[in-house]
Amino acid sequence: MAVFPLSAKHRKYALRALAVSIILVSAAYIASTERTERVRPQRVEQNLPPLSWGGSGVQTAYWVQEAVQPGDSLADVLARSGMARDEIARITEKYGGEADLRHLRADQSVHVLVGGDGGAREVQFFTDEDGERNLVALEKKGGIWRRSASEADMKVLPTLRSVVVKTSARGSLARAEVPVEIRESLSGIFAGRFSLDGLKEGDAVRLMYDSLYFHGQQVAAGDILAAEVVKGGTRHQAFYYRSDKEGGGGGNYYDEDGKVLQEKGGFNIEPLVYTRISSPFGYRMHPILHTWRLHTGIDYAAPQGTPVRASADGVITFKGRKGGYGNAVMIRHANGVETLYAHLSAFSQAEGNVRGGEVIGFVGSTGRSTGPHLHYEARINGQPVNPVSVALPTPELTQADKAAFAAQKQKADALLARLRGIPVTVSQSD
C-alpha cells in the first residue's frame, strides 16, 4: 500500500526546518545541562496554538494507493486501504450493484483520499470494460457518498521524466513510476530501431507525456509527446505530430528530422477502407454519462459488410464472440504486438497464419455498439497502446506539415533539453 501526503513544497520545507530546529534545540539543551551542575529543571505547561502555515492549519489529508489483486472485489481493496467497515458498507450498498464497479483489473490501483480526521473522503479508480476504461470517482459530502466527475475537475499536464538505466530499462522505468502504458508505448515506438530490453546500465531515457489529473491526483497517462533514448552514446528521438487534416484521428511519430521513425514491423496496411474516424484512442468526457473514459482503440465508421483486413502478417489467436467487443478477431504479430478487430458482422475463412492485407472479417455492429464500425486495438504485452505508435502505417510529412512539425519539435526538444545532465526523475509543466 502506497501513501501520498498532500503536502505543498513549502510545507515540506517548513516541516524539515521544524525537525532541524528540534534537533538543534535538543543539542543546545544537552550541552547546557552538561556545563551546569545541580540545576533542577522546572516543568512548565502551556497551551500552544496549532501549528499553521500561511494562516491555516497544516493539511493532514493524504492519498492511499492500493493495488487490486486477482479475485478482489471493491470491498476487499477498500478494506486493505484502511477504510472503516461502515464506510465500505455504505459504498457497496449504494453502488455495489452497478456493473462498472465490478470490472476491476488485477494490475490497476484504487486511490482513497483520507482526511485529517482519519475518515475517507474520496475514492477513485478505473473500471475495465471491453474497449473502454471508465473513471469512477466517489466523493463524500454531507455524510453521503456521491459520484463526482466533471471536465472542470480534470486537468491535463505534460509530465517530464528522466531515467538512467541501472540493471534493466523496464525495471528502471517502473521504479521511476513511469506508467506501464507509457513503458509499452515507448517499446513500440522504437521497436524498428532497437529493443527497449537491450538498453544497458548507463543508458538514458527522457520522456514527455500527458498525464490526467482529477482533484489533484494523477489518475492516468496519455500519449507520449516526445521521447529520447541514449543507447551506447547514440541519441534516438521521437516526436508526436498530428496535422490539422487528421483532426481527431490521432497523429504519428517522427524522428528529429521529420522522417518516418520506423516501418513498424510490417504494419503498412490500413485495416479497412473507412468513412471517418468516429472515436480516436485516448481519454474523453462522455457527453451523456458525464464520466471520463479511456477509449482503448480507434473506431472507424464504415458501411455494414466492409471487408476488414489483417494490418500485418501474424497468427490468429482468437476468433469468436468476446463480450462487449461482439464478434472479434485477435492476431499476434512480431515484436510482441497484438491487434484486435471488434464488432464484426461476420468472419472470413481465414485461420492460423495470415498475411497482411488478408480479409479476416466484415464490419458490423455486434456487441456494445451504436452502429456499424470497426474497433481496432493494438496491445503490447497485453497493455493497450495507441495504434498509431505501433500498428498503423505512418504517412510522410507534406511540405506544409514539415514547417509545423519543426516548430512543434523545437518546443518539445527544449523541454527535453532541461533533463539532459540533470538527475531529474519527474516534473510537471503547465
Curated annotation (Swiss-Prot):
Post-translational modification: Likely to be synthesized as a proenzyme. The cleavage of the N-terminal domain is probably required for the activation of the enzyme.
Subcellular location as annotated: Cell outer membrane
EC number: 3.4.17.-, 3.4.24.-
Keyword presence, Iron: no
Gene3D superfamilies to which the protein is assigned, alphabetical: 3.10.450.350, Glucose Permease (Domain IIA)
PANTHER family hit by this protein: CELL DIVISION PROTEIN YTFB, PEPTIDASE-RELATED
Protein name: DD-carboxypeptidase/endopeptidase Mpg
Organism field: Neisseria meningitidis serogroup B (strain ATCC BAA-335 / MC58)
Lineage per the UniProt record: Bacteria, Pseudomonadati, Pseudomonadota, Betaproteobacteria, Neisseriales
